[in-house]
Amino acid sequence: NQGGHCAKGAALREHGHGEKRLKYPMKLEGGKWKRLSWEQAIEEVGSKALQIREESGPDSVYFMGSAKFSNEQAYLYRKFAAMWGTNNVDHSARICHSTTVAGVANTWGYGAQTNSFNDIRNSKCMMFIGSNPCEAHPVAMQHILIGKERGAKIIVVDPRFTRTAAKSDEYVHIRPGTDIPFIYGLLWHIFENGWQDESFISQRVYGMERIQEEVKKYTPEEVEHVVGVPKAQMYRVAKMMAETKPGT
């Protein structure tokens, strides 16, 4: 963190004392939010929960924890589920992070990030897809900006023009949900121009032939139709990634 506080930690007080924090229960009635007393909210939620348990059994309820829980909150939440009578209690990481670990392990052979912050600082080209470290990971952003000061090119691919995009050399505005067609569109240009790293592929990659066959469907015209990014920009980004090394 280069000796500085992480913005997330510095802003932690806002979780409990921020002006925008919800301070009382609200209920949606007739399309409008109505304020409730704590007593009424507890009564309504409790009565409905007990009705569900009586009619469908305790295992009909699924308790989903949060990464924002403190240790004490997580402990109490698990105890509450046990008191309720079910083992159906899980954590959001099971949905978001476990799938990442499996995917990354299958792709890179290691179930975690494959490069360090020092690699980012020394990178000459960085691409961010659906990633906004300026707000989501401020400590990482410090290292990214050091890399930029050293001459690294930054490419940000996102439906929104984020704060990270404001620091980019190339902002690519894609339609939501078109990340994979975008990647295949880049690969189309890379294969078309022979920019792929054959040495790396032969030593560390299997199944590339199947990828090449699939990529043939993602012509510049098809990608522009699906993703919304013109051929010239797709070519420019692919060329930048292929020729500016090392990259991440």
Task: Give short role names for the model-derived ranges.
Residues 1-193, 217, 222, 230, ...:
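N-terminal export/assembly segments and adjacent metallocofactor-ligating motifs
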Residues 186, 204-248:
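Active-site phosphate/pyrophosphate-binding segments
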Residues 108-114, 201-210:
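Active-site-adjacent structural elements in folded domains
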